[in-house]
Design a protein with these regions (language model features):
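Conserved NTP-donor binding/palm subdomain of two-metal-ion nucleotidyltransferases/polymerases, i.e.
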Residues: 1-120, 126-280
Length: 280
């Protein structure tokens, strides 16, 4: 499969593989254009993840400065989002609305350095459209602004006073072409609120959905991007670090049941094989 990628793409995968395992690159490849490697990383929004792996390498100073600056920006943004996540979730809970953190800081918790996983917005899962509309009203009273044009069928968007997007998800993903799959996902969504676990990320504790359901959401998110929204390697990085952590046999069985019943087992196998081939 390696012939499908050029040497710079392969080198990016090698560095990411080391970074995701908290290992350092000891030797650079003299045949690789590292400016191009970083440009590819930038296009996939994973430059900051490379920082620990390259910290002791002999990367040219101008290229290293790009990585260093991007890492600094990402850490700052990560803490801004962390505080916003906590504020929004607590505000909604105080008003009787349960919200589950999707992706973002919750996913970052699995990385060796959580602060280096780049994210640009806040994603929350709510129980239904009625609660989502209520949440929008509550947030508007706190200075948040609802987007005038709502382009998605599965979430509503508002903006914080400091211009960070909040996506309030009314469903796990955009509807697929299969009515059977869509009905299954609608029923499955209810379980996200009854199967929970606490996760501490960057010093803040959140109530996330249980691992089996969380993995299934990551897969659905990948499938959505694969079919409709453009696919980046950061999605694969999330998949790698999730399964690299300790997941109980019971949660693995839950995940397997969900992918079998939803008809997404083949896609899960394909994504996992790609990760094994290119990200170790």
């Amino acid at each position: 499969m390696e012939q499908l990628l050029n040497k710079e793409q392969l080198e990016l995968c090698r560095i990411l593989s080391m970074a995701l395992r908290n290992k350092k690159i000891e030797k650079l490849n003299p045949d690789v254009d590292y400016a191009r490697v970083i440009a590819i990383a930038e296009s996939h929004k994973v430059t900051s993840l490379l920082y620990p792996a390259l910290a002791e390498s002999e990367l040219p100073e101008n290229i290293w400065n790009t990585v260093d600056q991007k890492a600094d920006q990402t850490v700052r943004q990560s803490y801004r989002l962390l505080m916003l996540d906590r504020y929004v979730i607590n505000t909604l809970q105080e008003n009787g609305i349960d919200a589950i953190l999707l992706k973002g800081c919750g996913t970052a918790a699995w990385y060796p350095v959580p602060e280096l996983r780049k994210s640009g917005d806040v994603d929350l899962l709510l129980k239904n459209e009625a609660e989502t509309l209520k949440a929008l009203q509550i947030l508007s009273e706190k200075g948040f602004t609802k987007e005038k044009e709502q382009l998605s069928q599965h979430h509503m968007v508002c903006e914080s006073p400091d211009h960070i997007e909040i996506e309030l998800h009314t469903a796990l993903t955009e509807p697929f072409d299969s009515d059977k799959t869509n009905q299954f996902l609608m029923e499955c969504q209810k379980a996200y609120f009854t199967h929970r676990r606490e996760v501490n990320t960057m010093g803040v504790t959140f109530q996330l959905t249980a691992d089996g359901y969380h993995a299934f959401y990551l897969l659905l998110h990948m499938l959505h991007h694969y079919l409709r929204a453009g696919f980046g390697i950061k999605l694969l990085c999330d998949w790698v670090v999730f399964w690299a952590k300790q997941v109980s046999d019971g949660e693995k069985e839950t995940f397997l049941r969900l992918v079998r019943e939803s008809g997404t087992l083949g896609f899960a196998q394909m994504m996992t094989k790609v990760c094994v081939c290119y990200l170790g």
